[in-house]
A protein has these predicted regions:
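Short, aromatic/His-centered strand-loop micro-motif at the edge of beta-sheets
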Residues: 86-107
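Short, solvent-exposed beta-strand-to-loop segments that form ligand-recognition rims
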Residues: 120-141
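Ligand-recognition surfaces built from glycine- and aromatic
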Residues: 134-164
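Beta-strand-rich interaction surfaces with strong enrichment in secreted/lumenal proteins
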Residues: 35-42, 94-100, 142-143
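Secretory/extracellular carbohydrate-interaction modules
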Residues: 25-85
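Short, exposed beta-strand/loop patches in secreted or surface proteins that constitute
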Residues: 14-19, 70-76, 110, 132
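Low-complexity, Ser/Thr/Pro/Gly-rich disordered linker/stalk regions
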Residues: 1-46, 116, 164
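Short tryptophan-centered beta-strand motifs in secreted/extracellular beta-sheet-rich domains
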Residues: 50-52, 103-121
Length: 164
């Protein structure tokens, strides 16, 4: 198991991080602040797993890496998972794959391999796709959007076996 990085996350673009009960709350400094995020203080290259145990109070728990983004409880359609490809920024909408029960903790794992990525929520694969992620180096982040507050109790980065 990798180190829990919640104590080391850096606020970005209006992000306010509040420590509370063994977790952190992440909010934007303004009601509709777009892309506020708590950023890891390190650069990651594929293959790795970006794992968050988190919850949202309403909408928009977002995870980012390079040009990629995962959007759970999207404000336009809370049940649709939005996946933006880290290499191309191509957007995918997956019906009935994006809902997280507000107020409940969820384990989200974003596995980024050299040539594919998967999104796993509470043990269920919600996205599996191909791409070339071999040349990307970027810092992962997690945050809210459009007035939501996201809480995170675990934020880990784990190297993956390239054969996986």
């Amino acid at each position: 198991m990798s180190e829990n990085l919640i104590a080391h996350l850096v606020p970005h673009q209006g992000c306010v991080i509040t420590r509370r009960d063994g977790a952190i709350e992440i909010a934007g400094s303004a009601m509709n602040w777009v892309m506020s995020a708590a950023v890891a203080p390190l650069l990651c290259r594929a293959p790795f797993a970006f794992r968050v145990v988190g919850k949202t109070d309403s909408t928009n728990l977002r995870m980012h890496w390079h040009r990629g983004e995962l959007i759970f409880n999207w404000e336009c359609s809370v049940r649709e998972l939005r996946v933006h490809d880290p290499a191309t920024a191509e957007q995918h909408g997956l019906k009935d794959k994006g809902f997280l029960t507000p107020g409940d903790w969820h384990e989200i794992v974003w596995e980024i391999g050299l040539d594919r990525m998967r999104v796993i929520v509470d043990g269920e694969v919600r996205f599996d796709g191909k791409g070339d992620y071999s040349g990307i180096e970027s810092a992962p982040s997690v945050g809210p959007c459009f007035g939501s507050t996201v809480s995170v109790r675990e934020f880990t980065i784990t190297p993956l076996d390239q054969a996986a």
